[in-house]
């Protein structure tokens, strides 16, 4: 099957965009067929992922930080009426990469590409708050306020 990479080019303050060629080389070296689509702004990863999942792409690869991963998971959730999400691959380009660290996954793109290509999966628990599915954490107070402020910031190159 062909994988769909949902790339947030802004992740890690444009780190994802800069490392895109490295990611593509890693996916090719792992023998993967893939298509890449870039998100254009906050929330777009949800709709792009939902469409990709409904079109039969598998796995879906979230290329970005924790926010991008969250959007991809929500897109997979919307595409799955039975609540069972399809396989998800991760390409860590974020500032913190909390989920990747908490799962003990490698930050090396080559290692991640080989892991995705192997097809090995594991289940993780998800939570829901106000119809938003979360994979790693949910917060109140300062953290979401900082996130909202960050979303409104101009994305300078």
List the model feature ranges, each with a label.
Residues 42, 67, 115:
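Positions that flank functional sites
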Residues 9, 63-65, 91-93:
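Glycine-rich beta-strand-to-loop/alpha-helix junction loops that act as flexible
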Residues 68-70, 98:
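Short, active-site-adjacent cap segments at secondary-structure transitions
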């Amino acid at each position: 099957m062909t994988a769909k990479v949902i790339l947030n080019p802004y992740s890690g303050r444009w780190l994802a965009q800069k490392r895109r060629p490295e990611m593509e080389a890693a996916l090719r070296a792992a023998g993967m067929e893939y298509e890449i689509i870039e998100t254009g702004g906050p929330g777009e990863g949800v709709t792009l992922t939902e469409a990709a999942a409904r079109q039969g792409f598998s796995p879906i690869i979230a290329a970005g930080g924790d926010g991008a991963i969250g959007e991809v998971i929500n897109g997979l959730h919307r595409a799955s009426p039975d609540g069972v999400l399809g396989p998800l691959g991760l390409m860590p380009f974020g500032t913190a990469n909390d989920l990747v660290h908490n799962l003990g996954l490698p930050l090396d793109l080559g290692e991640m590409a080989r892991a995705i290509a192997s097809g090995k999966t594991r289940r993780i628990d998800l939570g829901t708050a106000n119809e938003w599915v979360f994979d790693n954490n949910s917060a109140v107070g300062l953290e979401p306020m900082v996130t909202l402020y960050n979303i409104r910031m101009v994305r300078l190159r």
